[in-house]
């Protein structure tokens, strides 16, 4: 191993970002998706950064551009966050909210606050995913109360649906049914999360034009009726298309190709979601191959079936749209892949 790496296009990062800015949206990049690209966004755009863990703050220099998303915090963590200058927060339960409010009673400062709300998920995977956020009746109760709090400057709501969301974008109708008029009149910001689909072998992004139409519909309605700003929180949409994973063929036997990387240090998304990465140069007709990672795990498979034209040992296998949730594990002491920026 050692030759495999991620190759990230700076221009593609900025191009994906601009697609969202052209819709008239504020953007907060979801850092957990691929933190290494934060520097490009921070230096070249006005992006904010949605961060969930204290240690991830190292990827951003300007703390005024951070939205810190709380989970089970305490006074000690809040002290550290305030010392760093963070003043934008998202909370998803009343316990964490109460911790923040008590802390603010002793601070002579103002914060911007979003309450995370849960939306109904239409999925067959019941019990697989934790559901973040408060119920709409909690949001309807809390927002008017918080509007009176002198420690809160901008106030708003946050939600986030599943990754690769191709169908559930009827935001305006859902929000207008779930939230009372008084609630919407008392907010300044509304973060609609991410979930914009990206093209893989087993998924499509062809519905993006319709999705963008529904987002703009919501944004314009929210601004006209309630003078509130819409924020979108992309991760995969920016990171994936910007990144290719370059590997080398170590061996070929029968119809199996072994490469010098693993899903465990290059594409955990393959196991978790699961997605199937596109392969540069794959063809419609030809011999079928399995592309397997270098570990002894039988699940270490990038693609079960891909048609390639005369692959040879030493050739490159390049995976496309490979920049989302490509974090490494310590399985078999695998090294973390290098990240190379181009253009």
Whereabouts are the PLM-identified features?
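A charged N-terminal "starter" segment
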Residues: 1-111, 144-148, 152-153, 184, ...
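Active-site loop/helix belt of alpha/beta enzymes
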Residues: 121-251
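Residue-level marker for buried hydrophobic side chains located in beta-strands
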Residues: 49-50, 113, 190, 230
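Solvent-exposed alpha-helices and their adjacent loops that cap or buttress functional pockets
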Residues: 83, 106-107, 124, 191, ...
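A short acidic-Thr-Gly-centered motif at the start of a beta-strand
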Residues: 37-43, 222-223, 309-310
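Charged (often Lys/Glu-rich) extended helix/loop segments that serve as interaction or gating elements
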Residues: 228-343
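Active-site beta-loop-alpha junctions enriched in small/polar residues
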Residues: 30-36, 52-55, 71-73, 92-96, ...
């Amino acid at each position: 191993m050692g030759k495999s790496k991620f190759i990230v296009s700076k221009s593609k990062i900025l191009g994906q970002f601009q697609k969202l800015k052209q819709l008239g949206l504020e953007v907060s990049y979801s850092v957990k998706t691929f933190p290494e690209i934060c520097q490009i966004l921070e230096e070249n755009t006005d992006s904010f950064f949605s961060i969930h863990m204290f240690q991830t703050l190292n990827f951003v220099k300007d703390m005024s551009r951070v939205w810190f998303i709380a989970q089970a915090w305490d006074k000690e963590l809040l002290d550290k966050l305030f010392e760093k200058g963070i003043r934008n927060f998202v909370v998803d339960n009343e316990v964490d909210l109460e911790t923040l409010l008590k802390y603010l009673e002793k601070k002579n400062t103002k914060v911007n606050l979003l309450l995370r709300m849960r939306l109904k998920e239409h999925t067959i995977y019941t019990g697989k995913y934790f559901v973040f956020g408060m119920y709409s009746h909690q949001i309807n109760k809390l927002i008017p109360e918080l509007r009176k709090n002198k420690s809160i400057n901008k106030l708003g709501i946050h939600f986030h649906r599943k990754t690769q969301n191709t169908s559930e974008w009827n935001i305006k109708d859902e929000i207008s049914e779930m939230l009372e008029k008084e609630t919407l009149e008392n907010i300044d910001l509304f973060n609609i999360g991410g979930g914009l689909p990206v093209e893989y072998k087993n998924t499509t992004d062809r519905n993006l034009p319709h999705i963008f139409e529904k987002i703009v519909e919501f944004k314009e309605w929210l601004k006209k009726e309630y003078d509130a700003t819409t924020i979108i929180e992309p991760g995969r949409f920016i990171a994936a298309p910007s990144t290719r994973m370059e590997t080398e063929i170590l061996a070929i036997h029968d119809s199996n190709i072994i490469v010098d990387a693993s899903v465990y240090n290059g594409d955990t998304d393959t196991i978790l979601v699961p997605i199937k990465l596109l392969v540069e140069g794959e063809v419609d007709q030809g011999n079928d191959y399995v592309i397997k990672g270098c570990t002894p795990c039988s699940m270490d498979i990038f693609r079960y079936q891909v048609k390639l034209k005369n692959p040879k040992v030493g050739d490159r296998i390049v995976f496309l749209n490979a920049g989302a949730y490509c974090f490494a594990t310590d399985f078999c002491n695998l090294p973390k892949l290098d990240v190379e920026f181009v253009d």
